[in-house]
């Protein structure tokens, strides 16, 4: 009996070692929904996370991305914008900067249920991976959109604070900060240096799940 158990243990250990490890890009958090109920996450449990919504910009965005250092903010990307600037998208991919899908205003999805699927497919074509996170432009998530998100196994992420420049807000544990960069509403990306000097940013997963790790401010 002891000999059989020993052989089974050796066989199991060998099979485990032969299994390929999950890469960082396809971590366990990328294949499971964060919440069981259809709800938009607007706050975590620990630290601060920076998210930047991008639907406008050319050279300024490229220069800012080139200067970014880890840990990176999560970039919520509008697919119409992304398709116009493939070189910027290549840079984002090469630097392995976290990305997510930025949609239109929430009300639009009540009348056009195909829109989200179209945006999702275009995002996958651009980045080669399905986004874990989705945000509408106004952070409004209609019921039908929640259903589409659950079917696609994509999480709805709002924010606890939108920063449009000006005074630096006080730090709140678990905060998810959203910064706009649109044609009619945008923060000069270099202004984010002031925000980064006021707190230390973590990843979305770290803030939501309350894990800790090395933290580093964005470059000046």
Regions inferred by a protein language model and the residue ranges of each:
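Aromatic/hydrophobic pocket-lining residues that form the small-molecule binding cavity
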Residues: 61, 85, 116, 188-192
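Catalytic grooves of carbohydrate-active enzymes
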Residues: 171-210
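Extended aliphatic helical segments
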Residues: 31-34, 39, 49-52, 61, ...
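N-terminal pre-catalytic segment of deacetylase/amide-hydrolase enzymes
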Residues: 1-51, 56-67, 200-220
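Metal-dependent polysaccharide deacetylase catalytic core of the NodB/CE4 family, i.e.
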Residues: 70-183
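Glycine-rich, phosphate-binding/catalytic loops in enzymes
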Residues: 67-68, 152, 194-195
């Amino acid at each position: 009996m002891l000999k059989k158990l020993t052989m089974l243990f050796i066989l199991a250990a060998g099979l485990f070692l032969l299994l390929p490890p999950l890469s960082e890009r396809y971590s366990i958090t990328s294949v499971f929904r964060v919440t069981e109920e259809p709800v938009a996450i607007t706050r975590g449990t620990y630290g601060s996370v920076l998210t930047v919504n991008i639907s406008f910009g050319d050279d300024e965005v490229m220069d800012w991305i080139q200067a970014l250092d880890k840990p990176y903010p999560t970039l919520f990307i509008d697919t119409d914008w992304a398709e116009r600037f493939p070189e910027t998208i290549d840079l984002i991919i090469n630097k392995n900067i976290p990305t997510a899908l930025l949609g239109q205003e929430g009300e639009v999805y009540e009348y056009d249920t195909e829109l989200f699927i179209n945006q999702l497919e275009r995002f996958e074509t651009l980045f080669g991976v399905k986004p874990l996170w989705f945000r509408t432009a106004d952070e409004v998530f209609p019921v039908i959109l929640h259903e589409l998100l659950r079917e696609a196994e994509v999480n709805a992420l709002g924010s606890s604070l939108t920063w449009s420049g000006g005074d630096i807000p006080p730090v709140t544990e678990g905060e998810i900060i959203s910064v706009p960069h649109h044609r009619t509403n945008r923060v000069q990306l270099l202004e984010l240096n002031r925000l980064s000097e006021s707190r230390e940013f973590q990843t979305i997963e770290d803030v939501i799940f309350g894990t800790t790790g090395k933290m580093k401010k964005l470059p000046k």
